[in-house]
Amino acid sequence: MEDKKFAKERFIDGFLGGVEDWDNHLAEAINKDENPYLKDKLLKILKEQEDFGNAINSGLGREMWYSNDFFINSLILDFITGAEDDLVNELKQIWVGMLGKPGVNVEAINMNDEFEGYLIKMHFEMELNIHLISDLVAYYVYGMQISSERERVKLFPEMAELLLYLIDKKALLKKATEVAQNDQENQEDHNSPRLNIASELYEAGMKFVLGHEIGHHFLKHTESTGRNIVSKFVPADVTSNQLHLDEFAADNFALDLLISGMKERNDNNLLAPLIVLLMLAIYDKTPEEPNQSHPSFRDRYLNLLSRVSEHDEKVASGLQQIFNNVATWINYSLSESGYWKTEWWK
């Protein structure tokens, strides 16, 4: 009997634009003569990844086992390190493929008997948007630590610029081109409190998104026969729609996976899943309404907030206040009369 191919081969062979090493692919695609700044920056990133891999993976450098994206591979390794014994072997069957396609999309691919492993595909725009919303919210959270109102007000133009990039990728491309042409570097201190907040939100946001898709696989939502809805992941009295229940269960699985990996209390890790939903809601004019396959963003947000409240009610209350304030600011920044028809987060 012929050995089955693994999910990695399924991705590279089956998806247009699928490559074995995403970061190296980006670096090789840039002509140094045409864009020396970007070329040097991408090569620097590869070198930093090599050094990081040598430090944490016994000198194995950029060796990747669970994704074609170095950062995502590192996140899966984190999951494995912090997982209960019964999850470790399952997590080692995950493979995440990054694609350079437009669209805020990540998907657990249905199982195929011809291949081993669990395949997840992610579009680059999803990771980019998690980065942008993390930066945006980090300005607000950092501002909460500043006593001077005048200094806090200075942060809003930065937030407005990031919001523009979330809704207008042409504006982001224009900015990136200007930076490349002028060899501009971000002068913000890499050890600044705001950047630390943004980094924590970004990492936890990515873990939540990956954990959600891993949940779809582990709860058997991607299999053609049988389901394995673990009752603790299904919220009570929410809906009888099976597809909606799948989404709630995957959200809860992802949050539990995130919390189980926390070595110490970190409120930003718990805020991150909420702001991922806020980012996705920007592309939905009616976040209070469900569609055929997904519950409303309002219900998903309130479900996660309830789960955080079970973990720590005081923390949940603080995160709710942050979410309310940022969502309100986004709503009226995008339109004086309100971007969304309702204040769905309240």
Regions found by a protein language model. Name each.
Residues M206, G211-I229, D256-M262:
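Catalytic Zn2+-binding segment of zinc metalloproteases
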Residues A7-G18, W22, I30-N31, Y37, ...:
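Long, well-structured alpha-helical subdomains associated
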Residues G17-K207, L219-T222:
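Peri-catalytic and regulatory segments of divalent metal-dependent proteins
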Residues D189-S192, N196, E200, V209, ...:
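Acidic, metal/cofactor-coordinating or nucleic-acid-engaging core segments within structured domains
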Residues M1-K5:
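Long, charge-dense tracts
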Residues D78-G82, A249, F253, L257:
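Amphipathic alpha-helical segments that form well-ordered structural scaffolds
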Residues L219-F248:
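Post-HEXXH active-site segment of zinc metalloproteases
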Residues Q145-E149, V234-P235, Y301-L305:
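Glycine-rich loops and low-complexity Gly/Arg-rich segments
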